[in-house]
Amino acid sequence: MFGFLKKVADYTRDAADAANYLIQGLAVTFDHLRRRPITVQYPYEKLIPSERYRGRIHYEFDKCIACEVCVRVCPINLPVVDWVMNKETKKKELRNYSIDFGVCIFCGNCVEYCPTNCLSMTEEYELAAYDRHSLNYDNVALGRLPTSVTTDPSVQPLRELAYLPKGVMDPHDVPANQPRAGQLPAEVLKSLSLQQDSLQGDEGESLQDAPDQDQPKG
């Protein structure tokens, strides 16, 4: 008799624990239902990086003076600067410049300390390749302008997930139905057109009021 009651008590305790665990799991699920998604349907949806995003490095060959400051400030001495000394002008002549993005940590030190601003960080982040050797960009590849996600009609650009309202540090604190901070390119163009229309309307009203002021009073 006591053995049967013990089994019933153990079964009841296990059932209560299972129900408790189930409720805890459902609580987490329902809590995430009220949060905004943190993923996008890549590659059909792409994020618009922020202005200070550190993407692929853009290089301008004509501005480079082969000073090798970028090599000295790089934590891993990554940039390869190939130059020769011109005996007539006694100045360095740049032959080739390359950066291996398979090793680069995108710290931005080379961009920060470049004296001629020939290096700049772009918003391009799609650098995946089948061969790691193809990630070694020479001065020709580095000189290409970055591609924009907003020019492809098959891709829907999205706001950057890091754009949060003022004073908010955790993206989960923003309700799912609240729009993100920042604007899409179409919204920026629309706001600019509205501003231009309002300015033109103000100019038209000022021109109409000007002749009335010049007329003599009867």
Swiss-Prot record:
The residues forming the signal peptide are none
Report residues binding [4Fe-4S] cluster 2: 74, 104, 107, 110
Q: Where is the 4Fe-4S ferredoxin-type domain?
A: 55-84, 95-124
Keyword RNA-binding carried by entry: no
Tell me one GO molecular function of this protein: NADH dehydrogenase (ubiquinone) activity
Required co-factors = [4Fe-4S] cluster
Cofactor stoichiometry and binding remark = Binds 2 [4Fe-4S] clusters per subunit.
Give compartment(s).
Cellular thylakoid membrane
Keywords annotated in UniProt:
4Fe-4S, Iron, Iron-sulfur, Membrane, Metal-binding, NAD, NADP, Plastoquinone, Quinone, Repeat, Thylakoid, Translocase
> What broad class of enzyme is this?
translocase
| Family matches, as Pfam families | Fer4_7
Asked whether the UniProt record includes Transmembrane among its keywords, one would answer no
A GO BP term here is: photosynthesis, light reaction
Record EC number: 7.1.1.-
SUPFAM superfamilies documented for this protein: 4Fe-4S ferredoxins
Membrane topology label: Peripheral membrane protein
The family line of this record is: Belongs to the complex I 23 kDa subunit family.
| Subunit structure, interactors included | NDH-1 is composed of at least 11 different subunits.
**NCBIfam families to which the protein is assigned, alphabetical:** ndhI, NuoI, PRK05888.1-3
**Family matches, as PANTHER family:** NAD(P)H-QUINONE OXIDOREDUCTASE SUBUNIT I, CHLOROPLASTIC (PTHR47275:SF1)
- Protein name (Swiss-Prot/TrEMBL): NAD(P)H-quinone oxidoreductase subunit I
The organism named in the record is: Prochlorococcus marinus (strain MIT 9303)
Its lineage reads:
Bacteria, Bacillati, Cyanobacteriota, Cyanophyceae, Synechococcales
Encoding gene (name): ndhI
